[in-house]
Amino acid sequence: MQDNNRNLILAMVLSALVMLVWSIFFAPEPVPPAQDTPAASTQGTAQPEAGGPATPGAVPQGAAPELEAAAASSDPSANAGRVAIESSSLAGTISLAGGRIDDLELTGYRETLDTRSPFVRLLSPTAQTTVQAEGSPVAPGGGAELAVQKPYYAVYGWMPAAGTDPALVPGPATVWEVESGAKLGPGQPVTLRWDNGAGQIFRRTYELDDKFLFTVTQTLENTGTAPFSAAPYGILARHGKPDTQNFFVLHEGAVGMTDGKLLEKKYKDMTKLDPLPGEGPAELVEVQENGWIGFTDKYWMTTLAPAPGQSFTAVAKYAPGADIYQTEARMPVQTVAPGATGTSSSYLFAGAKVWEVINGYQTNPGIDRFVDSIDWGWFYFLTKPIFRLLHWLHGMIGNMGWAIIALTFVLKLLVFPLARKSYISMAKMKELQPQMEAIKERTGDDRMKFQKEVMELYKREKVNPAAGCLPVLLQIPIFFALYKVIFVTIELRHAPWIGWIRDLAAPDPSSLWNLFGLLPWAAPGQGSFLHSFTLPVLAILLGVSMWMQQKLNPAPTDPAQKMIFAWMPWVFMFMLGGFASGLVLYWITNNTITIIQQYTIMSMHGHRPDFFGNIRSSLPSRAKAGDKGGDKGGK
C-alpha cells in the first residue's frame, strides 16, 4: 500500500513541480514604460522617410543612415494619397509616400469576443491621422480615425550601388503615382510608378490573394544610355517595443528561416545585438537559396519572403535613439543595361498564424519551412502531432471543446498499455501486502534488511514497483505540449465550448465570488489579489476530480503524506483557476478517464478499490469516534 501511495505522491509532487517551474520561468515580465517616438522635418524625395526606417546598410559603399536621424524627420505619408486594400481577410490602404503598406486590419478577427469590438489592427501608419483611401466614400468628418497604435509597416525600395547617385533611386519617402489599378484585392493588382527624370523608370506592382499574402514585384526600366546599378530591398519596421505576453514559453520578436536554420530574436535581445559598422546593433545572415524574415506576435505575423531560390541578406537590427526594431531582406545589386529591365519579386505575409494557411504557403509559392513560424516549443515532436490531431478532431466534431475531450481519450488510449501495466502492478502490490507486513515484523528496525527482503520478494513475484511511475512521467511532456497548443495556436482563440465557456484560450470566466453570476456584483478581475480566490466552475471540477482520484487508495498512515494528500487537490484548484479553460478541461477529462481505468482494471484483477470506504476512513469525525471506541474498549 505504501508503494501505491508513493506513486500517487510522486504524481502530485511532479505536478507541483510543473507548477513551480511554471511560476518561476513563465511568469510575465514587468512591462517597461512605453517610450515616446521622437517627432519630426520634411525630407527631400529619396531621403529616408520621417519616422521611417533607416535605409538598408548593405549598400556597396557600406554606409547606412542612422535610424535616429530618420526618425527625427517629418512623415510625408500623412499628406500623401492612398490606395485601398480590400479582400475577404484584409482591409486597409497603401500610402503613396514610399509605397508603404502601413494601414492593415484583419477583418476575420476582433479584439474581444464582443461583436462590436474593432477588428484586429496589424499595421499602422507613422502619423496617427485620418486615413482616407482614394475612391472610397468619405466618412463623417472627412475620414476614419485610426486607433492609437505604435507605427508598424512594410516598405520597399532600391539602394544605389557604388557610383550611383542616391537621388536617382526611390527611397522610403519617395511619392509614387498610381499607374494602374484603383483598389488592391484578389485578382485586382495595383501598379505604382516613379520616374527619376534621368532615364530610369521604377515600377512596383502589388498583388493580393484571398488570405494574407502580398506579391510585390519591383522593376527597374533603364531608358538611359548607360548601365544603371541598384539593389532592391524590403523592410518591416516597428516603432517602440509592442505590448507582448512576456512569457518564457512564447517567442515574440524577430523570426526567420535562413537556409533551413530557424532564426529567433526577442525584442530585448535585439537591443543587445553587437553594433556593426554603418548599421548599429544588428545581425546579418547571408541566405543562399531559401529563407524569410519578419516579426511574430502570439497570433499575428508579418514576414518578408524573397522568391524561392533567391539569395539575399536577412537582417535584424535596432536603432536605440529612435527605438525602432527592424527586419530586412536585402537582395543583390542588379546592373540593368540600357534598354533592359531588371525585376525583383518577393512575398509579404501579413496576417494571422492560421496553420492551414501557413502550411498552404509553404507548398505554394514554396516558402521554406513556413510552418515553423508557429512557435511549437521544446516538445515540438509532440506539439505538432497533437495540434494536427486536435485540428482534425475539430474538423470532424465542429466544436473545439469537445475536440479537446476527444483528444484526451485518444492520448489516454495511446498510453493505455503502460497505464494497464501500472494498475496491474498496483493490484499485485496489494496481493503482496501481507507478505510485506510479515517482512516488516521480522526485520524490525533494520531498514537495510527490510529493503533487501522486499526487493527479493518483488523479484520472486515478478513485480516492478516503478511501473506506476511511467504513466506519470509521460504525462509531463504531454501536458507541456498540449499547453503550447492551447496557448499559441490561433485556432483556439475565441473558440467556444458550451454555455459560458466562449474562449478556450482564456480562463473560465465564471466565479464562485458572485455565485457564478447569480449575485449582482462582478468578480475581481485579473491582476487583483482576490482573483486567485474567485474559483471558476472548471477549477472546482478539477479539484473534485483530483480528490476522487486520491480516494481510489486508502490514505497513507504517515502523517506528513496524509497532509499532502488532504491539501493537494484544493491547492491545485486555486493554482489552476487562471489557466486557459481548454487546458483545465483536458486535465479534468484526463483525471476522469484515469479514475475509470484504475477502478476497472484493478477490479478485474480482484482488488476493487474501496472508494467509499476510503472516503469514510479519511473523515475526522469517524477517526475520533474510533479513538473513543478504542478507549472504552481499553477500559
From Swiss-Prot:
Keywords tagged on the record: Cell inner membrane, Cell membrane, Chaperone, Membrane, Protein transport, Transmembrane, Transmembrane helix, Transport
GO CC terms of this entry: plasma membrane
Region (Disordered): 33-61, 615-635
Topology relative to the membrane: Multi-pass membrane protein
Single GO MF descriptor: membrane insertase activity
Bilayer-crossing regions: 8-28, 396-416, 470-490, 528-548, 564-584
A Pfam family hit: YidC_periplas
Subcellular location: Cell inner membrane
Domain of life: Bacteria
Ranges annotated as biased composition (Basic and acidic residues): 624-635
GO biological process, one term: protein insertion into membrane
Primary residence: membrane
Assembly, per entry: Interacts with the Sec translocase complex via SecD. Specifically interacts with transmembrane segments of nascent integral membrane proteins during membrane integration.
Family: Belongs to the OXA1/ALB3/YidC family. Type 1 subfamily.
Functional description taken from the UniProt entry: Required for the insertion and/or proper folding and/or complex formation of integral membrane proteins into the membrane. Involved in integration of membrane proteins that insert both dependently and independently of the Sec translocase complex, as well as at least some lipoproteins. Aids folding of multispanning membrane proteins.
Name of the protein in its database record: Membrane protein insertase YidC
Species the sequence originates in: Paracoccus denitrificans (strain Pd 1222)
